[in-house]
């Protein structure tokens, strides 16, 4: 059986919290920001949790997290 490896792209995008939930960054905050309102950009600042339907696939990409 081959060695299990962590997907490096996933390890840079996600963090496992102490409670076991997975933290992710918000999308739509990199460019084309002039047409977005200040309120919208402010709400995109924080982090969010990965949705429960995607948790299994994220955990499969990070077997040691």
UniProtKB/Swiss-Prot annotation:
Q: Which GO terms describe its molecular function?
A: structural constituent of ribosome
* Region Disordered, annotated ranges: 1-27
SUPFAM superfamilies, A to Z: L35p-like
Q: Which domain of life is it from?
A: Bacteria
A Pfam family of the record is: Ribosomal_L35p
- Give start-end positions of Basic residues composition bias: 1-15
Q: Name one GO cellular component term.
A: cytosolic large ribosomal subunit
Q: What is this protein called?
A: Large ribosomal subunit protein bL35
